[in-house]
Regions:
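C-terminal secondary-structure termini that scaffold catalytic or DNA-interacting sites
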Residues: 1-2, 201, 237, 248-265, ...
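N-terminal DNA-binding module of tyrosine recombinases/phage integrases
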Residues: 4, 15-21, 25-123, 281-291
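Short, basic/aromatic-rich helical patch in the C-terminal catalytic core of site-specific tyrosine
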Residues: 22, 121, 157, 161, ...
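Active-site/catalytic core of tyrosine-dependent DNA strand-transfer enzymes
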Residues: 98, 193-194, 237, 245-248, ...
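Basic, Lys/Arg- and aromatic-enriched nucleic-acid-binding interface segment
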Residues: 134-147, 151-155, 166-230, 235-236, ...
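C-terminal catalytic core of tyrosine-transesterase DNA break-rejoin enzymes
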Residues: 166, 209, 213, 217-224, ...
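Catalytic-site neighborhood detector that most strongly recognizes the C-terminal catalytic loop/helix
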Residues: 182, 190, 246-248, 298, ...
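Short, polar N-cap/turn motifs at the start of nucleic acid-interacting alpha helices
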Residues: 232-239, 321, 340-362
C-alpha cells in the first residue's frame, strides 16, 4: 500500500491530569491499513506544539512501524547477516561478529534503535578503553581495548547505522556525533642500507634468500608473497603477477583469496638477479606449484610463519627489532631515494593513488625536495 502522509500538525488537547498532549498519525499498518497513532506530552501547550512538530517531521522521515521493531542489538545482527557478512573477507567479517557479540551486545545491545544517542556510543568507547579486554589475565596487557580496536568498532557501528538511516529506521546517524580514539601512528622504520647485506646473508643461511630478496626489491605484502605460484613469474618479461593473497575461506580455513582492492592486482617488474634466484629456487622443487613452499608441509607458507623467520633472521644478525611490514617500507624508501618516481612506486606497492604514497612517505619526499632545491640552487649559481 502506498505510504500516506502524516496528519498535518496533529491534534493538541489538555488532559485531566493537567498535562498537554499532542496526537499525530505516525504511519499506517501495511497489512490492515489502520493508522498508527503516537503521542507526545508536555507541561505547556507551547512545549507540546514544539514536540509535536518535531515528531510529525520525524514520522515523514522514519518508518515508525519498522523502527519500533529494533534494538541496537537486533539491528546489528540483521545488518551483519544481510549487508556485512556476504560482502566482507572472512577475517573482517569475524572481526565485526566478535565486536558485536562480545563488546556491543552485552553493554548497549538492548537500547531501542530509535533512542540510541551519540552519548551512548561515546560511553561505550570509554568503557571499552577502560574495561574492554576479555582476557585481563594476559601478562603485560592493560584491561582496556586498544585505540585501533575501538576505532574499528566505531567504523563498524557507523556503517551499520548509516544503513539504518537509508532504511528509514532512524533520522540520522548518532555515530556522527562521536569522537572515537585516534590511532597512534607507528614510527616508520626501515632496514638500514648498510645492514641489508648481513640480513640477506642470514636469510641465505636459513635457506630463504629468494623469498626475502624478492620482498626487499618489490615491497609485497606478506599475504601476497606467500601466495605466489610459479605461474606468476614471467621469465622473459621479468615480471611477477600479484593477483591473490593468503586468507581464510568462509569456513575459517586457510585459503587463497583475491586482494582487498583492485589496485592490489598488479604486475611488478623485477631485476634479472631476482629472476635468476627464483629460477634456481624452482629447480629445487620443480613439481611444486608454490614459489616458496614450506619445507615442513610442501604447501603455502602461513604468513605468520614468514614473520617468525624474519624475526629469527634479525636475531641471527643482531639487528634491532623491525616488523616484517617494515621491509615493505624499506623497499619504498630506498626506491624513492634512488630516483624512482612516486607514481611508479605507488603502482608497485598497490596503493590507491600516488597521493597516498606521498603522504605515507613524506619524510622521503621532503629529502628529495631538499636535494632538488640544492640542485636548482647550484644551477642558478652557474647561470648568474
Amino acid at each position: 500500500m502506498a505510504k500516506k502522509r502524516a496528519n498535518g500538525e496533529g491534534n493538541i488537547r489538555k488532559r485531566k491530569d493537567g498535562r498537554w498532549e499532542g496526537r499525530y498519525t505516525a504511519g499506517y499498518d501495511e497489512k490492515t491499513g489502520k493508522r498508527l497513532i503516537k503521542n507526545v506530552l508536555g507541561k505547556t501547550q507551547a512545549e507540546v506544539k514544539e514536540k509535536l512538530a518535531k515528531a510529525v517531521a520525524e514520522a515523514e522521515t522514519v518508518d515508525v512501524r519498522r523502527a519500533d521493531e529494533y534494538t541496537l542489538g537486533t539491528w546489528l545482527q540483521t545488518w551483519y547477516e544481510l549487508y556485512a557478512k556476504p560482502h566482507l573477507r572472512f577475517s573482517t567479517a569475524e572481526y565485526y561478529r566478535r565486536g558485536i557479540e562480545l563488546h556491543i551486545m552485552p553493554r548497549i545491545g538492548d537500547i531501542p534503535l530509535k533512542k540510541l544517542s551519540g552519548r551512548d556510543l561515546q560511553w561505550l568507547y570509554k568503557d571499552l578503553q577502560e574495561h574492554g579486554r576479555l582476557r585481563e589475565a594476559q601478562k603485560g596487557k592493560q584491561p582496556g581495548l586498544s585505540d585501533s580496536t575501538i576505532r574499528g568498532i566505531h567504523t563498524m557501528l557507523h556503517n551499520a547505522l548509516d544503513r539504518a538511516v537509508k532504511e528509514r529506521l532512524i533520522v540520522r546517524n548518532p555515530a556522527d556525533d562521536c569522537v572515537p580514539p585516534k590511532i597512534p601512528k607507528h614510527e616508520m622504520k626501515i632496514l638500514p642500507p648498510e645492514q641489508i647485506k648481513s640480513y640477506l646473508t642470514a636469510a641465505e643461511q636459513r635457506g630463504v634468500l629468494p623469498m626475502f630478496y624478492l620482498e626487499l626489491i618489490s615491497g609485497l605484502r606478506k599475504g601476497e608473497l606467500v601466495a605466489l605460484q610459479w605461474t606468476d613469474l614471467d621469465i622473459e618479461n621479468k615480471t611477477i603477477s600479484v593477483s591473490k593473497q593468503a586468507g581464510r575461506n568462509n569456513a575459517g580455513e586457510p585459503d587463497i583469496t583475491r586482494p582487498k582492492t583492485e589496485n592490489s592486482i598488479r604486475k611488478i617488474s623485477i631485476p634479472q638477479d631476482a629472476v635468476d634466484l627464483l629460477v634456481a629456487e624452482h629447480q629445487k622443487h620443480p613439481s611444486n606449484p608454490w614459489m616458496f613452499p614450506s619445507p615442513k608441509t610442501d604447501q603455502m607458507y602461513h604468513p605468520d610463519s614468514v614473520v617468525n623467520i624474519h624475526k629469527k633472521i634479525l636475531k641471527d644478525t643482531g639487528l634491532e627489532h623491525l616488523r616484517f611490514h617494515d621491509l615493505r617500507h624499506t623497499f619504498a624508501t630506498l626506491a624513492l631515494q634512488n630516483g624512482v618516481d612516486v607514481k611508479t612506486v605507488s603502482s608497485m606497492l598497490g596503493h590507491f593513488d600516488a597521493g597516498f604514497t606521498l603522504r605515507a612517505y613524506t619524510h622521503v619526499t621532503r629529502q628529495m625536495q631538499e636535494r632538488a632545491a640544492e640542485k636548482m640552487g647550484n644551477f642558478m649559481a652557474q647561470v648568474m
